[in-house]
Amino acid sequence: MNITFLGTSSGVPSLTRNVSSLALKLSQSSEVWLFDCGEGTQHQIMKSNIKSSQIKKIFITHMHGDHIYGLPGLLATLGLSGNSEGIQIYGPSGLRSFINSSLKSSFCKLSFPLNFVEVENFASENKILFENNKIKVNCACLKHKIPAYGYRVSEKDKPGIFDIKKAESLKIAPGPIYSELQQGKKVVLADGRTFDGKEFCGPPRKGESFVYCTDTVFSESAVSLSKNADLLVHESTFSVEDESMAYEKLHSTTIMAAKTALLSNTKKLIITHLSPRYTNKNAITPSDLLKEAQKVFPNTYLAKDFLTAEIK
């Protein structure tokens, strides 16, 4: 899996950073999941390597405008492009009303169904939000001025590496049989021989895990959600020098994000959602924010619009 940042600014866009949005590209699939959709997100998608037609799920963290104002326009565009499969939208209660009223007020009728899932109960009861045979999604309550939720996407373990040479040495012909063996299934060949796929595969490969936490001040639930994750994307609205504002507005400092990564044993941290007050022309720059976080959690990176990063 990999992610592409479509917006990395907090509150309002700047000349170099749009407001919040991130695209997750699933492994061995053309499917894309979108996390937050601030104003101008569809323009950012057009400038990226993401195709809007690939978007199948949208996850919204909370109902502040810099995370949702791009939704009506994006959905309308998808409707014009002939998307007929439908989109699953996950988020707080109130999201359905916002989208439906926006579309109704602008006389926009979509050509595909929207399926809404309200996440409150899933977060409070620690229930799995989505699951199939390859992946599962969990969510957790964060600490912000309005209800906000973090999301974790976890791949299930993958089959071990298939030993082709062993299969060839046993004169097993290449083809669909190899696929079944790689999945650990028992197969019977045309000549009557029986093989157990587990004998041809190495140990299972651990699936990748990605966590997205914004907007929030430091939160123990974010630590729990991020436990042993491969990649944590966490908001860092403020420098540690502006910690008082972080507590006032219930946003995170660089140190809070780094502390979350450290306590959760996350492997890699990317900080995002930076206040526009930090520019290369000001006393505190984005590079300074990165250095602050790296003092606590060295394997930290700084998000920027259109940055693509592998989960592992």
Swiss-Prot record:
It catalyses: Endonucleolytic cleavage of RNA, removing extra 3' nucleotides from tRNA precursor, generating 3' termini of tRNAs. A 3'-hydroxy group is left at the tRNA terminus and a 5'-phosphoryl group is left at the trailer molecule. InterPro entries: Metallo-B-lactamas (IPR001279), RibonucZ/Hydroxyglut_hydro (IPR036866), RNase_Z/BN (IPR013471). Its EC number is 3.1.26.11. GO terms for molecular function: 3'-tRNA processing endoribonuclease activity; zinc ion binding. Homodimer. It holds the Pfam family Lactamase_B. Coiled coil: none annotated. Binds 2 Zn(2+) ions. The keyword Cell wall biogenesis/degradation does not apply. NCBIfam families: PRK00055.1-3 (NF000801), RNase_Z (TIGR02651). It comes from the Bacteria. Zn(2+) 2 binds at residues 66-67, 215, 273. Belongs to the RNase Z family. Its cofactor is Zn(2+). Gene3D superfamilies: Ribonuclease Z/Hydroxyacylglutathione hydrolase-like. Zn(2+) 1 binds at residues 62, 64, 144, 215. Keywords: Endonuclease, Hydrolase, Metal-binding, Nuclease, tRNA processing, Zinc. It comes from Prochlorococcus marinus (strain MIT 9301). This is Ribonuclease Z. Zinc phosphodiesterase, which displays some tRNA 3'-processing endonuclease activity. Probably involved in tRNA maturation, by removing a 3'-trailer from precursor tRNA. The active site is at residue 66. HAMAP family: RNase_Z_BN (MF_01818).
